[in-house]
Amino acid sequence: MSNWLVDKLIPSIMRSEVKKSSVPEGLWHKCPSCEAVLYRPELEKTLDVCPKCNHHMRIGARARIDIFLDAEGRAELGADLEPVDRLKFRDGKKYKDRLTGAQKQTGEKDALISMSGTLMGMPIVVSAFEFSFMGGSMGAIVGERFVRAANYALEHRCPMVCFSASGGARMQEALISLMQMAKTSAVLARLREEGIPFISVLTDPVYGGVSASLAMLGDVIVGEPKALIGFAGPRVIEQTVREKLPEGFQRSEFLLEHGAIDLIISRGELRPRLARLLAQMTGQDTPEQAREAAAVA
């Protein structure tokens, strides 16, 4: 073996391999919209919103609750509930195996997390869908956790906010999943009768049985920028009606323009703007008014 190969080439290759392995995995993230390569710690500061094109990336349910609620005084509702394969359903794979896989992947028992806490000092209860868990599909446990959150709002007379991100009813639970549409709609009717505010925040994507029930029943319906919202997907609709759909069809901006939702709020503005809105809806001081009153006192 030549001296050049031993002294120069091999050490150079080894240094290159060491350098590659020293870069932590997940340190960089490519924006799916503009394809900008973003430094992960900087992206976290913008709440997973691309600083180049303002694309709102999908985030997990716990991350969403973490950036929305105050840090202190949180309590999870229905955390002990776990899904059961009552129908022994099987398509290409057993439902119980799909559940096990989703639980390992996400660290969650099912696709909805409900939590009580405060929003800028205001008592509140929040539910958030975990889209990574079987597409955020709604089955019996998702429905029950949502109902428990709504019952908490009824008992404590505090507002409720739900962040939806779902493909719809869970196919593997058949009629049990469809029943959750009626179950969640019924408890929201009770909130409305009692005059307790419910704000629905639609994030990318919201489809199927979730969009046909709880997601569109808010006293105020908010969309994140460019979120996909609908019942069936655009391609399915185009194939059915045999027509080309308008530009931006089913995006939150299109729905706002046509009166289907009330507001579009960027992720970084959700916390202060919903706090002000809920304060007005409940007759409480806004966070700004509370600070002014405390300063005067």
Curated annotation (Swiss-Prot):
Known pathway: Lipid metabolism; malonyl-CoA biosynthesis; malonyl-CoA from acetyl-CoA: step 1/1
Entry note: cofactor: Binds 1 zinc ion per subunit.
PANTHER family: ACETYL-COENZYME A CARBOXYLASE CARBOXYL TRANSFERASE SUBUNIT BETA, CHLOROPLASTIC
Enzyme class: transferase
Zinc finger (C4-type): 31-53
SUPFAM superfamilies xref list: ClpP/crotonase (SSF52096)
Role summary: Component of the acetyl coenzyme A carboxylase (ACC) complex. Biotin carboxylase (BC) catalyzes the carboxylation of biotin on its carrier protein (BCCP) and then the CO(2) group is transferred by the transcarboxylase to acetyl-CoA to form malonyl-CoA.
Record GO terms (molecular function): acetyl-CoA carboxylase activity; ATP binding; carboxyl- or carbamoyltransferase activity; zinc ion binding
Entry-linked InterPro entries: AcCoA_carboxyl_beta, Acetyl_CoA_COase_Trfase_b_su, ClpP/crotonase-like_dom_sf, COA_CT_N, Znf-ACC
HAMAP family: AcetylCoA_CT_beta
Binding site for Zn(2+): C31, C34, C50, C53
Keywords from the named record: ATP-binding, Cytoplasm, Fatty acid biosynthesis, Fatty acid metabolism, Lipid biosynthesis, Lipid metabolism, Metal-binding, Nucleotide-binding, Transferase, Zinc, Zinc-finger
Gene Ontology BP term (one): fatty acid biosynthetic process
Lineage of producing organism: Bacteria, Pseudomonadati, Pseudomonadota, Gammaproteobacteria, Pseudomonadales
GO CC annotations on file: acetate CoA-transferase complex
Coiled-coil zones: none
UniProt protein name: Acetyl-coenzyme A carboxylase carboxyl transferase subunit beta
All residue ranges annotated as the CoA carboxyltransferase N-terminal domain in the record: 27-296
Record-linked Pfam families: Carboxyl_trans (PF01039), Zn_ribbon_ACC (PF17848)
Subcellular localization: Cytoplasm
Cofactor(s) needed by this chain: Zn(2+)
Origin: domain of life: Bacteria
Assigned protein family: Belongs to the AccD/PCCB family.
Zinc-finger found in the keyword field: yes
